[in-house]
């Protein structure tokens, strides 16, 4: 989870903390298997990554785990000496926490401001197979396409980034068939072009509507 300092501020997320439960939230454990004394507070939380406030840290991102149950967290934030947020991965190898930059972005932006932001980079989605990482994202820098960062070794491999589509998906946020990945290790993405106005503003948008009946079997743009 990301810690939120105050709901009244506009850029308040900081730190990434970790806890897991095997009984639907009755008991909670740290990455090393140690049981939490509830409630979880600032003083007893396990910190996966300490991130300063006002770092453009995004909330509600994706997690995965390897065969040993070690967690991998996909997120983005910016370094204190930069105004460019970068995609990151945070993981636990069974002994300690690590973090690594995934992207090499050059475009600055800020999450500050009222309402829901039209964000130029999507919340990433991650899946892990052994030590192999598949990191799905959408970035305005790459034409807002469906993009994939891949590494065969999370700690040492160079990231290979490619676009999976040759068309824009607008404000799409990555999602995948979690059950198919869990059962067969096949990564199927749900893709739909989407739009969002900054601060809940309305935007014009066309969609395809398929009508199928005896009188009208057609595809049209609405």
Regions found by a protein language model. Name each.
Residues 46-65, 114-128, 173-192:
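Signature of short aromatic-glycine-proline-rich micro-motifs recurring in repeat-based ectodomains
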Residues 75-78, 85-87, 114-154:
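Loop/turn-rich, solvent-exposed surfaces of beta-rich toroidal or solenoidal domains
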């Amino acid at each position: 989870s990301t810690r939120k300092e105050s709901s009244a501020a506009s850029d308040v997320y900081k730190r990434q903390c970790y806890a897991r439960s095997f009984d639907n939230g009755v008991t909670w454990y740290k990455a090393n298997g140690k049981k939490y004394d509830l409630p979880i507070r600032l003083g007893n939380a396990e910190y996966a990554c300490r991130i300063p406030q006002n770092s453009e840290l995004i909330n509600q991102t994706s997690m995965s785990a390897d065969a040993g149950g070690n967690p991998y967290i996909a997120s983005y934030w910016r370094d204190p000496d930069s105004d460019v947020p970068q995609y990151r991965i945070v993981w636990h190898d069974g002994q300690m926490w690590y973090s690594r930059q995934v992207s090499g972005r050059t475009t600055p932006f800020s999450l500050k401001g009222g309402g829901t932001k039209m964000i130029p980079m999507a919340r990433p989605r991650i899946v892990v197979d052994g030590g192999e990482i598949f990191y799905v994202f959408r970035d305005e820098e790459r034409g807002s396409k469906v993009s994939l960062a891949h590494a065969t070794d999370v700690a040492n491999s160079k990231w290979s980034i490619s676009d999976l589509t040759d068309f824009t998906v607008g404000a799409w946020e990555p999602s995948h068939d979690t059950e198919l990945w869990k059962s067969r290790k096949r990564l199927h993405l749900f893709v739909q072009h989407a739009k969002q106005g900054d601060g809940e503003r309305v935007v014009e948008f066309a969609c395809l509507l398929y009508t199928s009946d005896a009188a009208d079997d057609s595809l049209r743009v609405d």
